[in-house]
């Protein structure tokens, strides 16, 4: 936590305070905060995000062990108990006005933690996982959800190659490795201010989890084919398919949400793909779909669901969702 400072810590507390209201997605709150606080540098923003998201991942564990639900105490607790900073070290990283609060972290907290508190899961979600996977399997899964999700990129083969991108990142001192399963993926050690980087702005790379890249690979879309991506959303897998097709053929990106398709537009422009055709549909019975009957070579359907599969990347969802959702 070299970039942690009183300024960065106070920013983390401010962001965490807003996220803990659970009125909006955490990533939206974080993005809006950074837009309003442009004095935070490129090395400071990732630290703010890491602290805030660590609190959300470990929320009930931190509440029980710190004896507080206050954002300030939870940020101090996550730095001590999750990131491993000693109480003495913490005092050098935060403003003097918080030193008394740091001392409170040293107080012993009586009582055993329940298994759902230990893994910071709502009781209903732990019970669901336990029933489906058994205690050992559920514990293993719950433990993995406490770890920060990897930061993966997909290389746009229409613009570049994985080797070229890796070489350029290495030349800039950015630590990156090829993904193990996706032939087009790159895993970063740290976020490096991606959205302002030339490779991103010119469409050479896109942020995409390796799992999503593999799903696109399984479609096996080929040059010159006609392909449909139902539930295309913001188009992550659509763009991967378009590149796999070597910017040839015809790729329809269908969705019932105009808002989601709107988010595809800037990504599509950066990608340089001309074979992608976003189309808003009313339902699965839309006439535009029926006109394609018998003409399509490949279909991808990644339908929206509860979203619980994204908990590692969106840990606030476990607190914003209810069992009935």
Language-model segments: residues:
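Class I Rossmann-like S-adenosyl-L-methionine
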Residues: 1-195, 245, 295
């Amino acid at each position: 936590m070299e970039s942690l400072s009183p300024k960065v810590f106070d920013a983390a507390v401010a962001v965490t305070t807003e996220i803990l209201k659970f009125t909006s997605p955490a990533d939206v709150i974080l993005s809006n905060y950074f837009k309003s606080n442009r004095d935070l540098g490129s090395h400071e923003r990732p630290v703010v995000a890491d602290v805030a998201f660590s609190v959300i991942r470990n929320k009930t564990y931190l509440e029980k062990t710190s004896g507080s639900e206050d954002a300030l105490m939870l940020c101090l607790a996550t730095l001590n108990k999750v990131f491993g900073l000693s109480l003495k070290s913490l005092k050098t990283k935060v403003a003097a006005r918080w030193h008394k609060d740091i001392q409170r972290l040293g107080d012993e907290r009586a009582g055993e933690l329940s298994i759902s508190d230990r893994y910071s899961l709502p009781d209903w979600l732990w019970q669901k996982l336990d029933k489906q996977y058994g205690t050992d399997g559920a514990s293993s899964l719950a433990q993995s959800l406490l770890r920060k999700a990897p930061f993966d990129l997909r290389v746009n083969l229409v613009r570049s190659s994985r080797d070229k991108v890796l070489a350029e990142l290495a030349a800039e001192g950015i630590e990156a490795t090829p993904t193990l399963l996706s032939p087009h993926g790159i895993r970063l050690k740290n976020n490096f201010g991606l959205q302002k980087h030339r490779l991103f702005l010119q469409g050479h790379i896109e942020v995409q989890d390796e799992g999503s890249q593999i799903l696109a690979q399984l479609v096996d879309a080929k040059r010159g084919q006609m392909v449909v991506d139902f539930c295309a959303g913001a188009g992550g897998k659509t763009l991967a398919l378009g590149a796999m097709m070597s910017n040839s053929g015809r790729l329809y990106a269908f969705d019932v949400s105009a808002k989601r398709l709107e988010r595809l537009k800037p990504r599509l422009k950066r990608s340089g793909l001309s074979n992608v055709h976003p189309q808003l549909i009313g339902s699965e019975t839309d006439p535009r779909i029926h006109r394609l009957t018998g003409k399509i070579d490949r279909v991808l359907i990644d339908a929206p669901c509860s979203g619980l599969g994204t908990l590692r990347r969106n840990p606030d969802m476990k607190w914003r969702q209810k069992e009935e959702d």
